[in-house]
Amino acid sequence: MSVDAATVRRIAHLARIAVTEDEVPHLQGELNAMLAFVEQLSEVDVDGVEPMTSVTPMQMKKRADVVNDGEIADQVVANAPSTEDHFFLVPKVVE
């Protein structure tokens, strides 16, 4: 894939970057070099390679998926000016 000058201008416009006509050829070369590198990556054989999320193998800490109230409802509403049954009371806004 190759990027032409019109594509460079379009990318600059979409990114809201001011690019002068003198800068277009340089940016065109830079973008083409980046795309060439990405094309090289597609040639790498990754069959049998497990996807990685970290460089060190580790397990996520898991907790039981149970519904609870957090057991701190009194603390949550402690600073509220007005509450009822662990709910915040607010003035009615919509009729």
Swiss-Prot record:
Enzyme Commission number(s) of this protein: 6.3.5.-
SUPFAM superfamilies membership: Glu-tRNAGln amidotransferase C subunit (SSF141000)
Catalytically driven reaction(s): L-glutamyl-tRNA(Gln) + L-glutamine + ATP + H2O = L-glutaminyl-tRNA(Gln) + L-glutamate + ADP + phosphate + H(+); L-aspartyl-tRNA(Asn) + L-glutamine + ATP + H2O = L-asparaginyl-tRNA(Asn) + L-glutamate + ADP + phosphate + 2 H(+)
InterPro entries referenced in this protein's UniProt entry, alphabetically: Asp/Glu-ADT_sf_sub_c, GatC
TM regions (residue ranges): none
UniProt GO BP: glutaminyl-tRNAGln biosynthesis via transamidation; regulation of translational fidelity; translation
Gene Ontology MF annotations: asparaginyl-tRNA synthase (glutamine-hydrolyzing) activity; ATP binding; glutaminyl-tRNA synthase (glutamine-hydrolyzing) activity
UniProt entry keywords in alphabetical sequence: ATP-binding, Ligase, Nucleotide-binding, Protein biosynthesis
Function: Allows the formation of correctly charged Asn-tRNA(Asn) or Gln-tRNA(Gln) through the transamidation of misacylated Asp-tRNA(Asn) or Glu-tRNA(Gln) in organisms which lack either or both of asparaginyl-tRNA or glutaminyl-tRNA synthetases. The reaction takes place in the presence of glutamine and ATP through an activated phospho-Asp-tRNA(Asn) or phospho-Glu-tRNA(Gln).
Subunit architecture: Heterotrimer of A, B and C subunits.
Entry similarity comment: Belongs to the GatC family.
NCBIfam families: gatC (TIGR00135)
UniProt name for this protein: Aspartyl/glutamyl-tRNA(Asn/Gln) amidotransferase subunit C
Source organism per UniProt: Rhodopseudomonas palustris (strain TIE-1)
Gene name linked to the record: gatC
